[in-house]
Amino acid sequence: GMAEAMIKHLPESTVRRLGIFAHGEENVKVHRDEPVFDGQFSNRCYREAVKQAFTHFSEKAIAQNRFDPDLDIILTEQWARIIMHLPYAFQAKRMFPDVFRHDRQHLESWKHVESEIGVMPEESDFETIEEWEKAMDGYRRAISKTESFKQFVEDRIEKGQRASSLIGNQYTGSIFLALMSTFEADYEENANLDNVTFGLCGYGSGAKAKVFEAEVQPTWREIASRWNLFERLEGRIAIDRVTYEALHKGLAKESIVTPKGEFA
């Protein structure tokens, strides 16, 4: 029954002529994959991927003579702003302590941090990997509460999370939103970003991260002035759950708001 009905809809092929179930299976299993979300595991994947991507970028920068660790200012201090993939607004702030430590652990300034929160836990000091990971989580939280880290976030990350905090959880395009948020915030505050370097970190499927950098062109003000991002976010219209589900399932027959300036 079901096998024949399925085969009827398949295009003509050798597989169809020979019988798609000719390998002996008598039962047809119909199923679908459902994602299982584990927040803590997901955050750990993000954190490790970002740290590895930053390490790889540093090694590549040294190999290409872009960066000399003995002579140059550390990379995260060279970047005027750091633009991150933000599935939620404070992801970068919460996930960046590892990179912050990694980039500074050889500096004199890091000794001041260690005098405040202690040295990093060593895996060899713990009986199990779980105990060490728990201690490391506590150490990252301690880093995030230091004045040096909080100032670092304020200077380089905070502006990128403003738009995300107004929108809520999102995934696709979040790095671009963080970039727009940063530029518009700096435009409104009349900051000078001409020719400065941004560090950027993308993240996506398969827990893969990519760190790269970009130089801001002097025309950035002209472009950012046209966005009106925060003004547009203020003009949003709230919808109820029924309307949301109709939109999500593609059941809505009419636009919720009057289309204006649409591309299609």
Q: Which role does the model predict for each range below?
A:
Residues 96-102, 214-218:
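Short secondary-structure boundary/capping segments
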Residues 119-147, 165, 173-179, 183, ...:
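Non-catalytic terminal extensions of PLP-dependent enzymes
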Residues 53-78, 97-101, 113, 182-190:
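Phosphate/pyrophosphate-binding loops at sites that engage ATP/ADP/AMP, CoA/4′-phosphopantetheine
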Residues 34-42, 80-83, 157-170, 174, ...:
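Cysteine-centered functional microenvironments
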Residues 67, 84, 105-113, 121-158, ...:
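Hard-cation-handling environments
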